[in-house]
């Protein structure tokens, strides 16, 4: 039987695999904010990035290792392909963390060996112990992944795993890279590893899975029943293609059905000991933070954290819930940190009160960013009678999102109506302080604003998504706007909020432009180096 840590470890890969969602690119300050909230959430491991991929990724992993990876905090992990250059960069990046981990991988399925790696099984069996041994010479905690394990020959998989453990791997990760397996198949794969790998008791079995068939969470729960003790997942289930296994769904499934899962961990059925170390009351807060910073809206019917997760429309259901919530609710909303919007602050609230509430919500701002956030708060308080936590989250997210900006919106003014053509006048300031103003017409006020901004910025792009939603109820509610721009096949998101949705649209468009420019500059300054014939964009 695999090494058993006594509970199920939660390995969060939001900052690595989750960030690979189209348009979800995060800057360093955003990654740090999410990592700090993940630490408050209580995850065991944070996979902070892929250090060899770029100077920006290296800096993000190193900064998180310095500021989040404390003695009692989460393990800080970096991803590395099975090459010495990747592994050395990863070791250097996680070095500041008291508890660091190198996560190295190579594909094991025949389709990957033939068409991607162009290597034989014999080649892989030689590479694995060499690279794992090298990683272990640099750090004590080494995780090894068999990419596309779900489509690998089990007998070959057993050989590779045995070799990796013998070389020093302390965690063995089994990825369902393309979300191909079914729960019974995936559970059987984990059971087979436990039965046929002689030294499996020296390592923890981990699983990583994508949601292409909507089975990722079900696969993971079946894996736990068969001996997996680490789950690699993301907040809101974000990730490549259809996403990854959802952290909040996994944690709450084991929380609500603890009596069912206890025996599979060798416990008595009625043991009250939690199956994970996650503080469930932080789940909603973490979900909202990730959604705000990535610009990826959580679907209303998303389990656990969706807007409708605890809503009841049917009269029969409403009647039952009013009499006893257990009639139609298996989770108390307070367990996941969800409470009714409350008036926590008002127009007379001071800077200290705003700062304290923002810290409770997971935002630790610099003095400069707090000053700007407080100014926006006071402006909003003059226009809006009730200020809620969602309002605060909306107005502060831009301070975290835009630490550096090529363009800054100075003002926007629009005129439109049933008998006039929509016209927008905008002023934009560049990084050198130069200010330019231009007017443009469009099919509507937002279209006119975007045309004017494009004229000023002169940055080629295609607008592929515009969405707006109300943060809270009421005619004076803040409107949140998300805009996605595409250039050269890459997506860049911008997110902003204001009581005037046209102003919010202008701010979101400028945010997206700034991300696009920064992304293009990173690509030109730090082109991907590829010392070995491996996939330059790992998905696991």
UniProtKB/Swiss-Prot annotation:
Which keywords appear in this protein's UniProt record, sorted alphabetically? Answer: Amino-acid biosynthesis, Branched-chain amino acid biosynthesis, Cytoplasm, Leucine biosynthesis, Manganese, Metal-binding, Transferase
Q: What is this protein called?
A: 2-isopropylmalate synthase
Region annotation (Regulatory domain) ranges: 408-540
Q: Which cofactor does it need?
A: Mn(2+)
One biological process term from GO is: L-leucine biosynthetic process
Its organism's taxonomic lineage begins at: Bacteria, Bacillati, Cyanobacteriota, Cyanophyceae, Synechococcales
Q: What class of enzyme is it?
A: transferase
Main subcellular localisation? cytoplasm
The chain positions of domain Pyruvate carboxyltransferase read: 8-269
Identify the Pfam families for this entry.
HCS_D2 (PF22617), HMGL-like (PF00682), LeuA_dimer (PF08502)
The similarity annotation says: Belongs to the alpha-IPM synthase/homocitrate synthase family. LeuA type 1 subfamily.
Which species is this record about?
Synechococcus sp. (strain CC9902)
Which pathway is it part of?
Amino-acid biosynthesis; L-leucine biosynthesis; L-leucine from 3-methyl-2-oxobutanoate: step 1/4
Report which superkingdom the organism of origin falls in. Answer: Bacteria
The EC number(s) given in the record are 2.3.3.13
SUPFAM superfamilies hit by this protein = 2-isopropylmalate synthase LeuA, allosteric (dimerisation) domain, Aldolase
